[in-house]
Regions:
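Short, low-complexity N-terminal intrinsically disordered segments enriched in polar/charged residues
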Residues: 1-57, 61-66
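Short beta-strand edge/turn micro-motifs at domain boundaries
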Residues: 2-4, 113-115, 125-126, 130-161
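A solvent-exposed, acidic/Ser-Thr-rich amphipathic alpha-helical stretch
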Residues: 41-108
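Short, well-ordered beta-strand segments in beta-rich or mixed alpha/beta enzyme
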Residues: 49-53, 113-120
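Short Pro/Gly-enriched beta-strand edge/turn motifs at strand-loop
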Residues: 84-87, 118-122
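Generic structural detector for well-ordered beta-strands
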Residues: 106, 121, 139-141
Length: 161
């Protein structure tokens, strides 16, 4: 059985290992504490772009929701703060790690295409489920000596079609 807390990439695969650390534990921990400062250096601000797939298969329905990093940061903080007000009957960190899979990273030179998938959910205190079932394609670049996010197409259906 997969250990959701264990980086699937050995430290000898430095690029993939670092990308996983950035997009799984650091991202989850920052979100759960609504602390943007934990991830702010994980982005390339110049030219950043974020597409909201709206959980739709057709690209005709996708939207340029985040034309700047600041636009994404503001929405990320809004979502993180809203999440913090909710009550869950299980450990949220464990549930999010269990729901998250990131095992496919394609690297060409100083660019990477990263596939992060969510398949599961969290049980709320009232017994309802907060379903997490989407995927995100991250576009990463080796920038200033480390891997950073330069854009993404997120909230895509999982599975597609």
């Amino acid at each position: 059985m997969r250990d959701p807390f264990k980086n699937p990439f050995p430290s000898s695969d430095a690029a993939r290992h670092a990308i996983w650390e950035m997009l799984v534990p650091r991202d989850i921990d920052a979100f759960l504490t609504a602390d943007w400062s934990m991830v702010q250096d994980d982005f390339v601000e110049e030219g950043f772009i974020g597409i909201d797939g709206r959980k739709e298969v057709s690209p005709d329905k996708w939207r340029l929701a985040f034309p700047t990093l600041n636009a994404y940061r503001d929405e990320w903080l809004r979502q993180a703060k809203d999440f913090a007000t909710q009550s869950f009957s299980e450990d949220t960190r464990t549930a999010i790690f269990t729901t998250t899979t990131l095992e496919d990273i394609e690297i060409e030179g100083d660019m990477a295409l990263v596939r992060k998938k969510f398949d599961g959910g969290l049980t709320k205190s009232d017994g309802t489920r907060d379903i997490m079932q989407w995927q995100t394609l991250y576009y990463c670049r080796l920038h200033e000596g480390r891997w950073k996010i330069c854009g993404f197409t997120g909230y895509l259906p999982n599975p597609m079609g």
